[in-house]
UniProtKB/Swiss-Prot annotation:
Job description of the protein: Specifically methylates the N7 position of a guanine in 16S rRNA.
Protein name: Ribosomal RNA small subunit methyltransferase G
Alphabetized UniProt keyword annotations: Cytoplasm, Methyltransferase, rRNA processing, S-adenosyl-L-methionine, Transferase
Gene: rsmG
Residues that, per the record, bind S-adenosyl-L-methionine: G62, A113, E114, K130
Length: 225
């Protein structure tokens, strides 16, 4: 079997397990919807993106059912992926998926993002999260995890520019990161507009970030002057 066929087979099996798992891991209930909104949305923005392709170890915070981390792990077996979620039922599901799919390049952690940062500070080449939190909150979680001159990605829809961008701008200096590039793309027959916003870590993250468990969401950094 060709490598590409093997990956496609694993993706099909993964979608089947994801939408049929007894604990709700996704809002999508059909293979078509799951493929477009979860698989394609994870792959399209990074398939030609050097900041991702040149990275060796990658972290996905709030991975849920494995989006995008597990999808990326299937397509990039030469890279290491660390998937983090604070909900034990989701991590248990991922253990099953990884075993069934015979994936060997994934490490699972059942931890809060704030605690995970204590043991994996300045460790990763690339960090991401999807649908976890507003951009300023997500950036506080992710910035401490990557090395200086490494990258952070956020998946966003069109509402990012009207609802979230102002909060993003307010945390860049505080976290020693800079916006690096925006990748815009479309998914599905209805051509839904999607964006991957990439940030570069330009200096050491101050030691007080991330703040203690629960504080980033309760008192978002983007709202603090």
């Amino acid at each position: 079997m060709k490598e590409s066929d093997e990956k496609a087979e694993k993706i099909n099996k993964y979608i089947e397990m994801l939408i049929n798992y007894p604990v709700n891991l996704t809002a999508y209930t059909t293979k078509k919807d799951a493929y477009e909104n979860l698989i394609l949305d994870s792959l399209i923005p990074i398939e030609a993106e050097d900041t991702f392709l040149n990275s060796k170890n990658i972290v996905d915070i709030g991975t849920g059912g494995g989006i995008p981390g597990l999808v990326w792990a299937i397509y990039f077996p030469e890279k290491e992926f660390y998937l983090v979620d604070s909900v034990s039922k989701k991590i248990e599901a991922l253990k099953i998926f990884i075993k069934e799919l015979k994936i060997t390049n994934v490490y699972l952690f059942c931890e809060r993002a704030e605690d995970f940062a204590k043991t994996h500070r300045d460790y990763f080449d690339f960090a991401t999260c999807k649908a976890l939190a507003r951009s300023d909150i997500a950036l506080e979680y992710l910035s401490p995890l990557v090395k200086v001159n490494s990258y952070i990605s956020l998946f966003k829809g069109p509402s990012y520019y009207t609802n979230e961008m102002k909060y993003t701008q307010n945390v860049l200096k505080k976290l020693n990161i800079a916006e690096f590039k925006e990748i815009d793309y479309e998914i599905g027959e209805d051509k839904k507009k999607r964006y991957m916003i990439l940030f570069k870590k330009i200096g050491i993250t101050p030691q007080n970030f991330p703040r203690q468990v629960g504080i980033p969401k309760k008192f978002p950094l983007g709202e603090i002057k």
